[in-house]
Structure formats: C-alpha cells, structure tokens
Amino acid sequence: MKHSVTFTKFLSMKIADLYIRVSTDEQADKGYSQRSQEEFLRKYCEINGMSIRKVIFEDHSAKTFNRPEWKRYLVELRKHKCQADFVLFLKWDRFSRNAGDAYQMINMLRKLGIEPQAIEQPLDLSIPENKMMLAFYLAAPEVENDRRALNVIHGMRRARKEGRY
C-alpha cells in the first residue's frame, strides 16, 4: 500500500521548465542575476513538489520574443508537445516587456498545454478577475521601457542644446 501512495504522488507531480532571463542593465541595477533567479525558482519547485525538466538561460531584452533560447524552446515544445506542465519565471517582466506579444505567447503556450507562471506574481488564469492583474503585470514593464526611452531622448536633446552631444 505504501508504494501505491508514492506512485500516485509521482503520477500527479507537476513538471516545470524554468526560464531565467536577464539583460545586462537589469542584472546590475535590480539584482536579477541568473543565479538568484535560478535559486528562487528551484526552491519554489522543491516546496511545491514540482520536478524540473529543463532550465533555460537567456541574456536578451524582453521587448520581443525574438530571443535565441526562447525560439529554441518553442521549437522543442512544438516538436514534443506537453513535456512540461509549467514554464516558470520570477516575475512577468522576465517573460516579456511587451503586453501584446505576451498575450499572444501565453495563448500559444496554453494551446501547447503549458501554463506560464511568475512565481513572485502568481495568477490563476482560470479565474476571470485575474485577467485584470495580468494586464497590469504585463503593461507595467512596457510602460517602464517606454518611459526609459523618452528619458533617453530628452537627455540627448538637452545634451545637444548644451553642446555635449
């Protein structure tokens, strides 16, 4: 009987892929090192009884999903559907900084049987009201990028007026 309980638990164990992304600025400014992200994600899986199938490390901007490791991951998922139950990342800004692209990618992953989840901003997307929180989590990084771009433009104009650029 003891073995059947263990086997049942094994059958229900969820499988996760871990997605760890940094851009050089974020890693330096906000402490989002790949090592710290991996530690948090591994601990989350351990606490929640999830097995880790794959760890994906990315060192590219999240403005688009045109990232080398992410593209490789999608090719693999399409070839071998449903190898994992979840793709986990620390926060939604690790996943994407473009709300429109993020919604499309979330839908694509869910069609492949994979649930994307930010462990520090968890949402049960089967609950309709959580769509509002998802909208906020996805829009905030995009707004931050847009603000940063405007600040750079204003800084360049000011520098040009002052003869420094």
Task: Describe each region flagged by the PLM.
Residues 1-159:
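Short, structured surface patches at the beginning of a domain
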Residues 163-165:
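Short, intrinsically disordered, charge-balanced linker/junction segments flanking boundaries
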